A protein has these predicted regions:
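AAA+ P-loop NTPase domains with strong preference for DNA replication initiators
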Residues: 1-113, 126-134, 138-144, 148-155
Length: 157
């Protein structure tokens, strides 16, 4: 379905964003550690020092996971800001959109849904953020969210 493909694409974008933040830094940190331990660039790491290198690699892996969760959270915050704009249109606040470049899509969504549906979508997005923060599988969280946001799910969101 379109929601599943979109979820996969969003995860791909978030992963690219997260990896871009860390790859160069990871190599620089590893090189700095090896230099401080007296290991020549490209040289073999003595067994007595491997635990320090392993510890650094584990820290880097945790940071990558955190970067991915942060990137996904940024996407979900963007979704929430769009839904906020939809709700503003639905309740006729007269306030300016936050996401002015998406005005036509916001107007279309506002006309096609009710304020109750938009509030449910905001709640589903908040729940997705919580699930990501609690280490749920990101692809499953995004798929569930996007399926729940799809217009085909009548009466829910």
């Amino acid at each position: 379905s379109g929601a599943v493909r979109t979820a996969a694409r969003l995860l791909e974008l978030a992963t690219e964003d997260a990896m871009a933040l860390g790859e160069r830094t990871d190599q620089e940190e590893r090189d700095a550690l090896l230099t401080s331990l007296g290991v020549a660039p490209g040289g073999a790491v003595p067994s007595a020092l491997r635990s320090q290198v392993k510890s650094l690699e584990e820290d880097q892996k945790r940071r990558k996971t955190r970067n991915l969760r942060d990137a996904l959270d940024r996407i979900l915050v963007d979704v929430m800001s769009i839904l906020r704009d939809v709700l503003m249109v639905q309740v006729n606040t007269g306030l300016t959109f936050i996401n002015v470049t998406h005005g036509p899509a916001i107007e279309e969504r506002a006309a096609a849904t009710t304020p109750e549906m938009t509030l449910a979508a905001l709640d589903a997005t908040r729940e997705a953020r919580e699930r990501i923060a609690h280490n749920s599988p990101p692809l499953l969280v995004l798929e569930a969210l996007l399926i729940s946001l799809s217009p085909a799910v009548k009466g829910r969101v």
